[in-house]
């Protein structure tokens, strides 16, 4: 089966994404079971799920890295990426979405849309990924299908169109109404393989009729022929509905909603049918866009195995047996093992050792990967996440991925002197795999610092150091990644002159510095050759290097723009080095006049608490300098939304547990940087000295 060639139209590259614990990995496990990839179903709470292949994942029961796997259903090849739902690992989601053609979002039927669902949805909007929704855990206490559909419309502004309705809920969830075919499926056994297709039960005919009308209206909106038939009261066939739905989904105009219980094996085969019927193939999406490396001219590549090669390395992983694996999506052309490809981002040729298709962590070697396929490459030396691999006669650079900056850091040291080098190598490998993880040395203290997206993120990094790389280490207290910025528009000079026998040094520039929205902008406004062109990049470099350490407390400076307005040079003594130093001097002089302030990460926090504890929890958030944004009731609990400075959130989980007797839970994610109050700023400066 696996060796059969499938035409591109029968490919589906999809991601499965959700909030933590919505049942995403369980759903993927069931898909693999039904498509014949696994013979025994793995359970995440038993620590045996096939897709969760790192030891930490099996222990914690959560998915950290996005495993990629290929399976087959109804004569289609489905490539699935299971992405993590925990906010600290959004980088994995971002990477996966960049290379997928469609996504299935899984919701928990008792909670509907949750904070991480919103984050993932926004990321998918960014890449215009067509989506469908599977409302899972219909068998659980408090399951509410229509409430969940409502949250899709209210919180995500999605045009959510149910294609199914559940028959019963909680313990009595026994089947699914198919609104497209206008019939019902009743489940007879626990494996979900024995099911009866029957008529819609009497007591549900009215609601089914109402929702089928809504479905027809939704497809009529995207298909004029159906609109005419609908208005004239003509019968619309199942095939016509399916075709229109497919077009609506691919155009991002309709989000179909299905339901089921992956754990109880209900609704999974219908979900697979819907993936095949409504999700796009590589041929249905726009040709991939990129730029010509030398001219910067925009170009596109078609999804065609005969076209020149264009592929994107979207993830680097280290495999204990074969070393570095580069997970890659082939957009056009064909990649063959043993051949050379051109890495257009690095400007280097790379040799492809072997090509493998992945099934979670089992590998199947192949001779080639064609347009539309996902696979992993063994043997690349210089390729990192986001690099384009192409044909050196037809170079192209595909749009890269943008990753958020880390917001939390901790100091780390090996327990033994001998472990220092080993730790350095291990940290470099981990940083190569994960663009949101950074490691650097604090120049003042000489300590090694690791920085990431949250406490869990860094915990798992430390865990991997111990397990995979056998490095025992001590970890300091988490520190907030503060930044600095400027509030005034100022002009400043930087002049570096040195005469000490032999050739001197001369660099001189005038800059204007001002606040801006972006991280950093450099604008060369020199006219009349006051500074020769070849020295301009050196000034820019000098400013960027100096901005890594601000004047308030030595934190990186962001949200500022520099305009280079004037300067002078010396025919003999001027050099790149002299202008680089002049640039950094001008930056420091400008900072001292520009009313610099300290910024701190502000986190978007969502706390779910039983009503009786609400007063206590809100009081506690206020005492942490939090700003309450709103509250929403949800099935016997309240959802409190607030912005709270990260520095006030350390150890919050313990406080919340004691204030709610273990019944409250929360999620938080980085939202923006904001100014630190004067009293806190003085405290931070005091601690840095």
UniProtKB/Swiss-Prot annotation:
Keywords, sorted A to Z: Cytoplasm, Elongation factor, GTP-binding, Nucleotide-binding, Protein biosynthesis
Protein location: Cytoplasm
Domain tr-type G: 9-283
One annotated Gene Ontology cellular component of this protein: cytoplasm
GO biological process: ribosome disassembly
Pfam families: EF-G_D2 (PF22042), EFG_C (PF00679), EFG_III (PF14492), EFG_IV (PF03764), GTP_EFTU (PF00009)
A GO MF term: translation elongation factor activity
Residues bound to GTP: 18-25, 82-86, 136-139
Cited function: Catalyzes the GTP-dependent ribosomal translocation step during translation elongation. During this step, the ribosome changes from the pre-translocational (PRE) to the post-translocational (POST) state as the newly formed A-site-bound peptidyl-tRNA and P-site-bound deacylated tRNA move to the P and E sites, respectively. Catalyzes the coordinated movement of the two tRNA molecules, the mRNA and conformational changes in the ribosome.
HAMAP family: EF_G_EF_2_B
Family: Belongs to the TRAFAC class translation factor GTPase superfamily. Classic translation factor GTPase family. EF-G/EF-2 subfamily.
UniProt-listed PANTHER family: RIBOSOME-RELEASING FACTOR 2, MITOCHONDRIAL, TRANSLATION ELONGATION FACTOR G-RELATED
Protein name as annotated: Elongation factor G
Organism name: Clostridium botulinum (strain Loch Maree / Type A3)
């Amino acid at each position: 089966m696996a060796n059969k060639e499938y035409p591109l139209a029968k490919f589906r590259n999809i991601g499965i994404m959700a909030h933590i614990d919505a049942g995403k990995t369980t759903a993927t496990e069931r898909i693999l079971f039904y498509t014949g990839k696994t013979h025994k179903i793995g359970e995440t709470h038993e620590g045996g799920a096939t897709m969760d292949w790192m030891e930490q994942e099996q222990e914690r029961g959560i998915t950290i890295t996005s495993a990629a796997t290929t399976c087959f259903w109804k004569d289609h090849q489905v490539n699935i990426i299971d992405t993590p739902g925990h906010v600290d690992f959004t980088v994995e989601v971002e990477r996966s979405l960049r290379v997928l053609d469609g996504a299935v979002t899984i919701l928990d039927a008792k909670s509907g849309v949750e904070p991480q669902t919103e984050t993932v949805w926004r990321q998918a909007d960014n890449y215009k990924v067509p989506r469908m929704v599977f409302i899972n855990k219909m068998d659980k206490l408090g399951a509410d299908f229509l409430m969940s559909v409502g949250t899709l419309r209210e919180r995500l502004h999605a045009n959510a169109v149910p294609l199914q309705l559940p028959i019963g809920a909680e313990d009595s969830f026994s089947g699914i109404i198919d609104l497209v075919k206008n019939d019902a499926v009743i489940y007879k056994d626990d494996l979900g393989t024995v099911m009866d297709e029957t008529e819609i039960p009497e007591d549900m005919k009215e609601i089914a009729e109402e929702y089928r009308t809504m479905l027809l209206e939704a497809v009529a909106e995207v298909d004029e022929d159906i609109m005419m038939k609908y208005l004239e009261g003509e019968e619309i066939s199942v095939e016509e509905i399916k075709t229109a739905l497919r077009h609506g989904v691919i155009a991002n105009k309709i989000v179909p909603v299905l339901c089921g219980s992956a754990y109880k094996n209900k609704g999974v085969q219908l979900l697979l049918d819907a993936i095949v019927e409504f999700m796009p193939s590589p041929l249905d999406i726009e040709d991939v866009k990129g730029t010509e490396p030398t001219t910067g001219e925009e170009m596109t590549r078609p999804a065609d195995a005969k076209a020149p090669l264009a592929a994107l390395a979207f993830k680097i992983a280290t495999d204990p047996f074969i070393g570095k694996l580069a997970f890659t999506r082939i957009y056009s052309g064909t990649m063959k093992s043993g051949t050379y490809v051109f890495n257009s981002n690095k400007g280097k040729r790379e040799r492809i050792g072997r090509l493998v298709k992945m099934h979670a962590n089992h590998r199947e070697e192949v001779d080639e990967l064609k347009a539309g396929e996902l696979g992993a490459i063994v043997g690349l030396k210089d390729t990192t996440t986001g690099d384009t691999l192409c044909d050196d006669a037809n170079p192209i650079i595909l749009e890269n991925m943008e990753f958020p900056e880390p917001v939390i850091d901790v100091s780390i040291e090996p327990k033994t002197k001998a472990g220092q080098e080993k730790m350095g190598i291990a940290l470099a490998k981990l940083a190569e795999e994960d663009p949101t993880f950074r490691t650097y040395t604090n120049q003042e203290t000489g300590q090694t610092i690791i920085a990431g997206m949250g406490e869990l993120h860094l915990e798992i990094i430390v865990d991997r150091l111990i397990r995979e790389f056998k490095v025992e280490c001590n970890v300091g207290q988490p520190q907030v990644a503060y930044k600095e910025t400027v509030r005034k528009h100022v002009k400043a000079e930087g002049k570096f002159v040195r005469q000490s026998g032999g050739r001197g040094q001369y660099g001189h520039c005038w800059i204007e510095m001002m606040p801006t929205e972006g991280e950093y902008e450099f604008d060369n406004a020199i006219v009349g050759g006051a500074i020769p062109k070849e020295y301009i990049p050196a000034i820019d470099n000098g400013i960027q290097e100096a901005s890594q350490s601000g004047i308030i407390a030595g934190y990186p400076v962001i949200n500022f723009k520099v305009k280079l307005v004037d300067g002078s040079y010396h025919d003999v003594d001027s050099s790149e080095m002299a202008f680089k130093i002049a640039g950094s001097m001008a930056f420091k002089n400008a900072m001292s006049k520009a009313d610099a302030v300290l910024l701190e990460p502000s986190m978007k926090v969502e706390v779910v608490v039983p009503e009786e504890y609400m007063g206590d929890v809100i009081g506690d958030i206020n005492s942490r300098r939090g700003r309450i944004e709103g509250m929403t009731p949800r099935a016997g609990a309240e959802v409190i939304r607030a912005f709270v400075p990260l520095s006030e959130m350390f150890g919050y989980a313990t406080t919340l547990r004691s204030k709610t007797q273990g019944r409250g839970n929360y999620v938080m994610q980085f939202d923006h940087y904001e100014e630190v109050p004067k009293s806190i700023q003085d405290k931070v400066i005091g601690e840095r000295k």
